[in-house]
Amino acid sequence: MQVLVRDNNVDQALRALKKKMQREGIFREMKMRGYYEKPSEKRAREKAEAIRRTRKLARKRAQREGLMSNGRISALR
């Protein structure tokens, strides 16, 4: 990964590098590889993440359609 340093502004270059690494998911990858994860634990984690994504998408769809307001399902009258 490469970041240009302009006008000897190292702080700005570090912020840009950190933002790129965050976008690429490098910090998350480093955290996950910090210790061994058993294959069964990996499957369970990935399944839980998929469920979380699905629920989040369903919430967004419901909110877009006007069925929800502020995270709660409004009563249909």
Curated annotation (Swiss-Prot):
One of its GO terms (cellular component) is ribonucleoprotein complex. Keywords: Ribonucleoprotein, Ribosomal protein. Residues 55-77 are annotated as: Disordered. One of its GO terms (biological process) is translation. Gene3D superfamilies: Ribosomal protein S8. GO terms for molecular function: structural constituent of ribosome. Transmembrane segments: none annotated. This is Small ribosomal subunit protein bS21. The gene is rpsU.
